[in-house]
């Protein structure tokens, strides 16, 4: 639990409700979200942009597109609540904007789990994101 708290503190202010997003990724994939996805490919983590390197990176690309479609809330600041029931993420917000934010995060966590077999360690610490090729618009 302490590791999760440290991870959350490190991620605060990067994008979205990162405490919740980090928990979802950990629950769905069993991987540490910061060390496994914090700088993965061209789209996962801070400053992500560019043509996805693989299906795992595409999950992050789609997630960023999901955030861009939001107009009534701020994914960088707004927080939501969810629960983990029978190994399933349940978004519990009545506020439509916060529910949409939760659903975006839920979708990326599930996508990352479903694409664990495409996870490639050579893309894990990709700090050369400025050299990623331009991606298609969302």
From Swiss-Prot:
Q: List the disulfide bonds.
A: 42-132, 44-60, 59-111, 65-138, 66-104, 73-97, 91-102
Q: Where is this site: Important residue of the cationic membrane-docking site (MDoS)?
A: 121, 124
Q: According to the UniProt entry, where is the signal peptide?
A: 1-16
Annotated compartments:
Secreted
Found in which tissues?
Expressed by the venom gland.
Provide the site residues for: Hydrophobic membrane-disruption site (MDiS).
Answer: 128, 131
Task: Show the segment(s) annotated as Important for membrane-damaging activities in eukaryotes and bacteria.
Answer: 121-134
Q: Which GO terms describe its cellular component?
A: extracellular region
Where in the chain is the site Cationic membrane-docking site (MDoS)? 129, 134
Record GO biological process: arachidonate secretion; defense response to bacterium; killing of cells of another organism; lipid catabolic process; negative regulation of T cell proliferation; phospholipid metabolic process
| Pfam families according to UniProt | Phospholip_A2_1
Indicate yes or no for the key word GTP-binding: no
Q: Which CDD domains does the record match to this protein? A: PLA2c
What are the protein's GO molecular function terms? calcium ion binding; calcium-dependent phospholipase A2 activity; phospholipid binding; toxin activity
Q: What is its main location?
A: secreted
User: Mind telling me which SMART domains this protein's record contains?
Assistant: PA2c (SM00085)
Keywords for this protein? Antibiotic, Antimicrobial, Cytolysis, Disulfide bond, Myotoxin, Secreted, Signal, Toxin
Quaternary state and interactors = Homodimer; non-covalently linked (probable alternative/compact dimer conformation in solution).
Role: Snake venom phospholipase A2 homolog that lacks enzymatic and anticoagulant activities. In mice, it induces conspicuous local myonecrosis, edema, and a systemic interleukin-6 response. In vitro, it is cytolytic upon myoblasts, and weakly bactericidal. A model of myotoxic mechanism has been proposed: an apo Lys49-PLA2 is activated by the entrance of a hydrophobic molecule (e.g. fatty acid) at the hydrophobic channel of the protein leading to a reorientation of a monomer.
Q: Which family does it belong to?
A: Belongs to the phospholipase A2 family. Group II subfamily. K49 sub-subfamily.
What is the protein's name according to its record?
A: Phospholipase A2 homolog 1
